[in-house]
């Protein structure tokens, strides 16, 4: 291989091309084309070189019929085979019959010449090169000129599917051809490397004609409309006009006037009416009086009845403005209710409302519930959120008198009856007391109790059942020591009156413990027949009267289902 490389470097008449594939379908077969450019005797056409290469391909196919090897391995085998071949066979393989005398002389020292540069400073060598004649210079120049043309044009015509880069000479083996290809490339012009920044009046467009044409044009066809001019009337007169406008509106809606010291808010509608009236205050006020589309203040537009209904609806339904509008404030829309709610929250009326609601919740509500939202939304005692089985919240001490008839009928279905342990003892066997266990202790019960009433202190006697016309109400007041919960509308015969829960059947006081209670609903009296109770009560001895008015059981107003 060293001999071949020295031959390629020193022979002026040979130009080698890179190994390339002769057939696109068989990329594994590589060959090398050499074109002689020295003299007419040693010139070969490219067709003859291709015929030699086809012969080499057939030899390779016959010698290696086995499995195909990779391209790199075939290239290495070809290089190693060509390096081991003698010089004469290598020249015959590439189509050379005779060699130049200069190449034969320099091939003897190929081992040392491979590591030396092409140029030398030896005077003898320079003289021999000069004496060798002008033939060498002509051959070198012709090789440099014709190598790119042969490899680029003829090979590209024969193999159009192959890229032109496969037929160019290697830069390491042929510095002459690489330098010629570099010389063919034109350098970049100077204006492409350094661009000029176009700044200045000479690079600007002339828009004078465009601006002159647009001076008379309008942005839109509609004319501008004046909404307010602050320079015509002084500020004091404007404030007086606004105050009079608000005063007239208050007089029409609620019949009252604004205080003198209160600041007047701006009203865009009133000011716009003043502009339309050419700043005539009297005419603007006259138009505002009869204009139904004037934007009114939210708090001023609502009457006192509407405010009370809204507050009651807010206490019952919370922030469900649809229910408030449907049930409480039907004269307003849902949007107006929402607007009034946010205006109402900023007023002193809302502060007073929240204070009263929180006070009522602390006094009568369950302990530990102090949330402001729950106070405002669920603090109504008559609201739908209160369970039916829970007792009604007592009224203040000032409301001890009998309420209206519809309140008594409404509470009759929700408030359970309660009895003390003394009544259950009086209904027991003779000589022993019948103890009714509390609701938390297991055991048999005389009557299945309902939910036990709350243990909150009561300031008045709970309302009794509705008495019929023939039943006289109880007139005797209970003893001072008796619990108000023991007084019920169920009375017994005179022989067996009720005894206070704080005294035993023998008259001795009991321990100060919370008396057990039995809650009886009206429907449960239907389980007991009057004929079964009267003989049972007649067998018991009489007890001293306790001061309570009593009637026979047959006269009791019992509702059966």
UniProtKB/Swiss-Prot annotation:
InterPro entries xref list: ELM2_dom, Homeodomain-like_sf, MIER/MTA, SANT/Myb, SANT_dom
SMART domains found in the cross-reference section: ELM2 (SM01189), SANT (SM00717)
Domain of life: Eukaryota
Keywords assigned by UniProt, alphabetized: Nucleus, Phosphoprotein, Repressor, Transcription, Transcription regulation
Domain ELM2 residues, every copy: 195-292
A single cellular component GO annotation: nucleoplasm
Region of interest (Disordered), ranges: 1-28, 52-188, 360-515
GO terms, molecular function: histone deacetylase binding; transcription corepressor activity
Predominant location category: nucleus
Modified residues (Phosphoserine): 11
Ranges of Polar residues composition bias in the record: 140-165
Pro residues biased stretches: 439-451
Presence of keyword Transcription regulation: yes
GO biological process, one term: negative regulation of transcription by RNA polymerase II
Extent of Low complexity compositional bias: 417-428, 453-482
Domain SANT: 297-349
Localization per Swiss-Prot or TrEMBL: Nucleus
Function field: Transcriptional repressor.
Assembly and oligomerization: Part of a complex containing at least CDYL, MIER1, MIER2, HDAC1 and HDAC2.
Name of the protein described by the UniProt record: Mesoderm induction early response protein 2
Protein source organism: Bos taurus
Gene: MIER2
């Amino acid at each position: 291989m060293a001999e071949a490389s020295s031959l390629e470097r020193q022979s002026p008449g040979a130009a080698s091309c890179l190994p390339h594939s002769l057939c696109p379908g068989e990329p594994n077969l590589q060959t090398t084309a050499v074109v002689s450019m020295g003299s007419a005797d040693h010139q070969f056409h490219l067709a003859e070189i291709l015929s030699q290469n086809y012969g080499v391909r057939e030899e390779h196919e016959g010698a290696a019929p086995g499995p195909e090897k990779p391209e790199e391995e075939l290239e290495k085998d070809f290089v190693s085979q060509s390096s081991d071949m003698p010089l004469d066979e290598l020249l015959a393989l590439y189509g050379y019959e005779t060699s130049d005398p200069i190449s034969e002389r320099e091939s003897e020292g190929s081992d040392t010449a491979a590591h030396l540069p092409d140029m030398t400073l030896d005077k003898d060598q320079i003289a021999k090169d000069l004496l060798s004649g002008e033939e060498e210079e002509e051959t070198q120049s012709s090789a440099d000129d014709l190598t790119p043309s042969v490899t680029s044009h003829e090979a590209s015509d024969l193999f159009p599917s192959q890229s032109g880069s496969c037929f160019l000479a290697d830069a390491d083996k042929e510095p002459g051809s690489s330098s010629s290809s570099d010389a063919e490339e034109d350098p970049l012009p100077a204006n492409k490397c350094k661009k000029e920044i176009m700044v200045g009046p000479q690079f600007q467009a002339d828009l004078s004609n465009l601006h002159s044409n647009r001076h008379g044009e309008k942005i839109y066809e509609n004319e501008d409309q004046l909404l307010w001019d602050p320079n015509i009337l002084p500020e004091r007169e404007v404030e007086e006009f606004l105050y009079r406008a608000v005063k007239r509106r208050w007089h029409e809606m609620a019949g009252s006037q604004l205080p003198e010291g209160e600041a007047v808010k701006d009203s865009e509608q009133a000011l716009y009416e003043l502009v339309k009236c050419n700043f005539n205050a009297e005419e603007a006020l006259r138009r505002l009086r009869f204009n139904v589309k004037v934007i009114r203040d939210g708090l001023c537009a609502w009457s006192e009845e509407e405010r009370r209904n809204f507050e009651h609806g807010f206490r019952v339904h919370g922030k469900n403005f649809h229910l408030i509008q449907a049930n409480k404030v039907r004269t307003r829309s849902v949007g107006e209710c929402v607007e009034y709610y946010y205006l109402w929250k900023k007023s002193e009326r809302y502060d007073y409302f929240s204070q009263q609601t929180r006070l009522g919740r602390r006094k009568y509500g369950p302990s530990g519930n102090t949330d402001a939202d729950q106070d405002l939304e669920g603090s109504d005692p008559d609201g739908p959120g209160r369970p039916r089985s829970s007792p009604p919240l007592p009224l203040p001490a000032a409301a001890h008198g009998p309420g209206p008839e519809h309140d008594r009928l409404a509470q009759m279905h929700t408030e359970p009856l309660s009895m003390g342990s003394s009544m259950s003892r009086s209904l027991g066997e003779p000589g022993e007391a019948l103890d009714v266990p509390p609701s938390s202790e297991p055991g048999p019960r005389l009557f299945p109790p309902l939910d036990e009433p709350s243990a909150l202190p009561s300031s008045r006697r709970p309302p009794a059942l509705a008495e019929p016309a023939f039943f006289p109400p109880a007139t005797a007041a209970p003893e001072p020591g008796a619990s108000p919960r023991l007084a019920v509308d169920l009375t017994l015969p005179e022989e067996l009156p009720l005894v206070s829960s704080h005294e035993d059947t023998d008259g001795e006081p009991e321990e100060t413990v919370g008396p057990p209670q039995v809650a009886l609903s009206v429907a449960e009296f239907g389980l007991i027949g009057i004929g079964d109770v009267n003989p049972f009560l007649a067998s018991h001895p009489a007890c001293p009267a306790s001061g309570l008015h009593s009637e026979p059981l047959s006269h009791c107003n019992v509702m059966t289902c």
